[in-house]
Amino acid sequence: YPIQDIPLSHPIFNIVFKITEKAQVPSIQYWRGSRDGTTSERGESTSEVHIRGMYDKNGRLMVVMTHNTDIADGWEKEREDHDYFERFAVKKSYPLGINIVVYALTH
């Protein structure tokens, strides 16, 4: 099964929450140490976020994977830093995670 970029038009980006961009979520450690507000941990050359998937022979999405974004830190680091939680968990990580779970449960 080839790995393919999932387009923003896919239902996974709007089944519950309307997601209009593939958000870059830095690790909490990088974000705390970043003085210039960047979210790309390895510089400008890695600033493009990819959300990719694998589809079955009928075109159903089976696997979701992310690249150049640490979406899971937004799910697991909510009590460590209130600003990080508000900026990344509430606005970026949770909406995508909820959409992925709801999509998986309904398809």
Describe each model-derived feature in a short phrase.
Residues 1-107:
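Extended, composition-driven regions rather than compact fold-specific motifs
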